[in-house]
Amino acid sequence: KKVLIVLFSVFVAGFYAQAQAQKVNVVSVSKERDIHNFYTMMKEAFPLAYNDPAAPRFIFFDDNKNFIFGVGGYVQLSGVYDFNGVEDYNFFTTSTIAMKGHQPGASYGMTVGQSRLFFKLVGNTDVGRLVSYIEMEFQGPQNTPKLQQAFVQFKGFTLGQAWSTFGDMTAVPTTIDEEGPSSGIEIRQPMLRYTYHINDRWQSSLALEYAKASYTTGKNAESIRQKVPDIPLNIRYTMKNGSHVQVGAILRNIGYKNVVKDKDKIRTGWGVMGSGKLNITSST
C-alpha cells in the first residue's frame, strides 16, 4: 500500500507541474525530434548510478508535444553457487556470512529480483527543466515490486526518494550484485534537496533527508522515531573530459529512549567523505 501511495503521489506532482508549465508558454520539444537528442535529454536528466537504468526504450509525447514520457528497464537473472552460506543471493554482504561451524553449507540459487522497471517524464519550460521519475525493483515477497526511487526535480530542487546527497553514486564502480564495494555510501532516502550550479565546472547540493536509524539498544535503551533530519552537503568539480572530484559532509542526530530515566535522548554525529572518477579514455 505504501508503494502505491508513493507512486500515485509522485505522478500527481509530476503531472500537476506539467499542467502548470503549459500555462507559462512551454518550449516545445518538437524542435528536438531526432532520436539522438531525445536519448540525450532522457539520459542527462540526472546523474546515474552504475546500476541505474539509462534512457527508456519507449517514448510517448503529450498532445502538444511539450513533454516526453518514457518507459524502460531491464531483466537481470543472477545465478549463484555458494560454498559458505551467503544469506541473500541479491546482496553479497560479507558481514552476514556465518562464523565457521555455523554455516549452512553449500547451496545454489537464482534470482531476478534486481530487474528494473522505471517511468520518466521530462519537459523543458521557459523557467527550467522538469523531471518526474519512478523506479522499482522486484525484491519484495514473491518478487513483488519494491520502490527504489520516486522524485520530482525542478529549478534545482529534488523532492522525493533518491540517492543520498552524502554519497557519490557516479563514482561507485560496477559490481554484479547491488551491495557494491565496501567503501561505497549507497542508500536511497526521502529528501528535500537543492542543487546550485555555480558554473559549468562547479556545483553544490544541500539537503534534508529522512534516515531510519539502526543501532543496538541493550537493556537500558529503546529505539524511537528520529526527531531531526540528516543534513548532508557536497560540492563537486567536473573536468572537461567528464572526470570529477567531490567532497561532502553530513550532520546527523540519532535519538533513543533512556529507559532508566524515562527520557528521550539525542546524540549528534558528523562525517566527511571524498570521492572522484578519472576517465582514462573517452569510452571509460
Predicted regions mapped to residue ranges:
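Outer membrane beta-barrel
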Residues: D62-Y89, M99-A213, K227-V228, P232-K240, ...
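N-terminal periplasmic/intermembrane-space "pro-region" immediately following the signal or transit peptide
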Residues: Q18-Y81
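Bacterial Sec-dependent N-terminal signal peptides
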Residues: K1-V24
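Detector for outer-membrane/organellar transmembrane beta-barrel domains
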Residues: N241-T284
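An exposure/low-complexity boundary signal
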Residues: F15-A17, R129, T217, A221-D230, ...
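Intrinsically disordered, low-complexity segments enriched in Ser/Pro/Gly/Ala and basic residues
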Residues: F8, V27-V29, G242, S282
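Flexible, solvent-exposed coil segments and beta strand-coil junctions
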Residues: Y50-N51, T94-K100, M169-I176, A211-T217, ...
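Flexible, surface-exposed loop regions and adjacent strand-edge segments
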Residues: D88-T94, A221-Q226, D262-K265
